[in-house]
Design a protein with these regions (language model features):
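Extended mixed-charge, aromatic/glycine-enriched low-complexity segments
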Residues: 1-357
Length: 357
């Protein structure tokens, strides 16, 4: 079961800084993994022993089998990385208190403008409206509190400068309304606007300007880590759909903002309209940054890991990075100053099937 051990399977054989130590012997056997190997072996044998109309069909079947086997192995590796990276989120939630906040951010799928009544021809060739969601989570008196910051961005590219300015806006708002917050932990997916040297290195300046120290920044594996943003996005889309069904049109960013804030808005969500201008920046080169998934910041520099808590990591002092980052200047106007909303109570425990029947 060596491929079940995160310290062993996720270690880098070439770089000792990203190599974990494991004292296990890895002499156990996983029955499900062995069953999978047996099924794949029997399937390959059946293909080789089967009769085909021509040699080309047999080679095509074997090629399809090899591609499917490779996809299964990649999916298994993905599951291991997903679980290991999710441990970063769990550890952060366990250490949250009044002075710490976890921020999960993601670009929602662009909203396609909608009219209350529109023809079939008007449905096509639409230009979507960009909107960004940041969910703030903190713990107060042993209860988790959540709040969503929604930025409707008009005429702006979803790039690193835009993300940096939105991050600073959220942290500055939190610091102004909750001065007790001292540090923040960020979590996002591997989109290029997040997983860029400009965005990551700008965290130092964001911390100084906002007054909240960005202590840690983690990237989730695909489809594993931004569910909080997706849940708020689904609720808001339904809210906008109801607004359109009442006879309103949502064609511009201003109308989209009006839809999100209609009838008191969405509980626990705050909406801001962002006017984006052209950006200017100096790209900072960081070789191999696409393979780094965990970043821990300090006053001296940043320590990075390829997999969460695998190896001692590699430290980069701030002096190693040359160039200056120029953020995108946006016109921000925050509406709906709602307080934090408490998370709903946990669902009731599932009953045993025998007790139901």
């Amino acid at each position: 079961m060596s491929d079940h051990c995160s310290q062993y399977a996720l270690s880098d054989s070439k770089d000792p800084a990203f190599r974990g130590t494991c004292t296990q012997d890895h002499d156990l056997i996983c029955n499900r993994c062995e069953d999978l190997k047996a099924v794949l072996s029997e399937t390959q044998k059946a293909i080789q022993e089967s009769c085909f109309e021509c040699q080309y069909d047999k080679e095509d079947a074997l090629h399809r089998f090899q591609e499917a086997t490779r996809a299964i192995q990649l999916w298994k590796s993905h599951q291991l990385r997903l679980v290991n990276q999710d441990n970063a989120r769990i550890d952060v939630i366990e250490c949250l208190d009044d002075s710490k906040v976890l921020l999960v951010q993601d670009w929602a799928m662009k909203f396609l403008p909608r009219q209350y009544r529109e023809s079939q021809g008007e449905w096509f060739a639409k230009k979507g409206i960009s909107w960004h969601i940041t969910v703030a989570i903190r713990k107060k008196e042993s209860e988790l509190e959540t709040q969503a910051f929604v930025h409707v961005v008009e005429k702006c590219i979803q790039d690193s400068p835009c993300v940096v300015q939105l991050m600073e806006h959220v942290l500055s708002t939190l610091k102004r309304e909750h001065p007790e917050i001292k540090s923040a932990f960020y979590r996002q997916d591997n989109a290029g606007c997040y997983h860029a040297a400009n965005t990551i290195l700008a965290c130092k300046d964001i911390s100084q300007r906002s007054g909240i120290f960005i202590q840690q920044l983690d990237f989730s594996d695909p489809q594993g880590g931004k569910g909080a943003c997706d849940r708020f996005a689904a609720t808001m889309k339904n809210h906008v759909r109801s607004f359109v069904n009442e006879g309103n049109d949502v064609l511009t960013a201003e109308q989209f903002l009006s839809a999100l804030t209609s009838r008191g808005g969405v509980s626990g969500a705050r909406v801001s309209l962002v006017q984006g201008n052209s950006s200017s920046k100096t790209n900072v080169k960081w070789p191999g940054i696409s393979k780094l998934n965990n970043f821990e910041f300090s006053s001296d520099g940043v320590r990075v890991w390829r997999a969460y808590q695998v190896g001692e990591g590699k430290f980069f002092p701030w002096s190693e990075f040359e160039g200056t980052f120029y953020p995108l200047y946006l016109s921000l106007s925050l509406t709906l100053p709602l307080p934090y909303c408490y998370s709903p109570p946990p669902p009731p425990q599932k009953k045993d099937f025998a007790s139901i029947v």
